[in-house]
Structures are given as C-alpha cells and as structure tokens.
Amino acid sequence: MSTNGHDPHPESTKDKVLVPEELRPRVPKAMSVAASDSGAGAGIQSDLKTFAAHGVYGTTAIVAITAQSTKGVYAIAEVPDEVIVAQIDMMMEDIGADAAKTGMLSSALIVEVVADRLGAWGVPTVVDPVMISKSGDQLLQRNAVNAVKRHLIPMSRIVTPNIPEAEVLSGRTILTEDDLREAARAIHALGTEWVLIKGGHRTATATDVLFDGVEFIEMPSERIQSLNIHGTGCTLSAAITANLALGMAMVPAVEAAKSYLTGAIRAGYAIGGGHSPVNHFYRFPEMGPSAAQGTSDGARAISTTDGDR
C-alpha cells in the first residue's frame, strides 16, 4: 500500500474509462506460419513487416529457427510439432485471422501439422512453397514434397511457386510458355483455387502467370537487376495475404502485391555482404533512409522472382 495515501496503481481507479467493444476499431489480421530469419530479410520477420506496411495486424506460428544472413543459411532448428500446434490454435482461438500464409516448412511432419491446423480453422491460406533459398541452401527436405502436394496445396487458396518450385510440384521441365501453362494446370489439379507461377527465373521473359483453373492471366514485368532481392518471394506472398485480409479479390490482391514489391526492391537498403533485403516501409519515408529516393508504386514493374527467397 502507498504510504502517502495515493493509489500506486492509477490504472485500477474507479474513474477509468473503458471503450465499449463495439466502438473499438476493427483491424484486419493475418498469420504467418514460417521460419525465423535472424537477418530479418525473409521469413517471419519479413512477413510481419509486410503485414504492418499494409495496415494489417500480424501474428505468427514459428516452425523453425534459422541462423541466416544475407550470405546464406547456416543452421536450422525445427520447433517441436506440439508447439507449432499450440501457436496456431492459441492465436486462432484468441485473435483469429482473416488470411494466413505458409513459408518455409522444412519437414513432412511440419507440413502435415500445419495443413491440419490451418485447415481445421478454415482460414484462407496462401502457400509459398519455399524449397531453396536465394543463396542455394536447401530449405525443404526432399521427402516433404509429397506432403506439400497431398496436404498443404489442397487446403490453400493460392500457391505461389517460382519456376524451379513449379517444376518440382508439377513434375515438368519449364522451358516455354506452353510448359509453364501445363505446370500451372498440374499444380491446380492438386486442389488449390489459384496458382501464381512467378516467371523471373526464365531468361527470355519475366512474366508471372495467374491461373484459376479456367483462365490464364499474364502479368508481364520488366527485368531489373538489383542486389536487394533477399526475401522477395516471402514479401510477395505476405503482401498477397495482407491484401486478402483487407478484403480484396484475388486478381487485384496479386496485382497490388506485385506493385508493392516493386517499390520495396527499388528502395532497398544496403545491408550485409550478400543479397540485401528490400525496404518494406518505403511508403513511409519517416521510417527509413529512403525519403530522398522518391520511390512509389508507380515505378516500373519488376520480376517477382529475381532473387526469390
């Protein structure tokens, strides 16, 4: 008790005013189920920054911890499956999510656990089938590919592979436009609603293709060389997730996400000695050194897979 007669906890006084629940502003919410990147350029950290930049409240379920920098991935420690389940269930039970995304899920067990819980909660899910990092490090165990195809893709709203990932998921080599479309059909047949194959790994063009099972929508991009390419795949899928949480339909959600990524790459920071990260907050010049760069979403399009991951 206070010796001077004053309440030491003024927040507990009777004159405290509580805002009624119905008057509190509703905030769109999104969940990222992925790995932690100690360099903060990709993974959970990148997803949270992307959500925040879109005005979306982000929650997480961390499935692995990586020792990672702009130069590569040096160690991976998986989180026990019961802890992954607890993270997803506790967040969904309390906070909920208008949309979710998956990133690096390194093992078949983790893939199955995540697919089961997100499917049980019925949250619209963006599946970013992360397999290999930009530095060439294997992030998805080879025996986990079938789990992705059998468990994760069927419960997803959209799958966002780059060319190498699309080849693995479809079992097809992609050299031509026809190859890409056949791969999209094969991936769509696994049970997802939409497929976005990111074309930046093709040398001749940098056209992303969005497919809903009926119509192919080509999204051409100008290929721009940049060192700020770490985490671009994570950022794109997180931006799509944020836009879905905001209530956007799929086509405009993807278009807006591509535009956001363009600006984030152009305003990227010079950080580290490898592939530098993008600037997730380029729209807010007061938050970083990009104020003088004059970046905007009106900038020319950029391939969403130049430096994917």
Where are the language model's segments positioned?
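Short pre-catalytic strand/loop immediately N-terminal to key active-site residues, enriched for Gly-Thr
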Residues: V33-G39, F216-H230
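Conserved N-terminal subdomain of the carbohydrate kinase-like
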Residues: K16-S32, L48-Q138, F284
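Conserved phosphate/ATP/ADP-binding segment of small-molecule kinases
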Residues: R142-F216
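Short, small-residue alpha-helix embedded
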Residues: Q45, T50, E167-V168, S226-M250
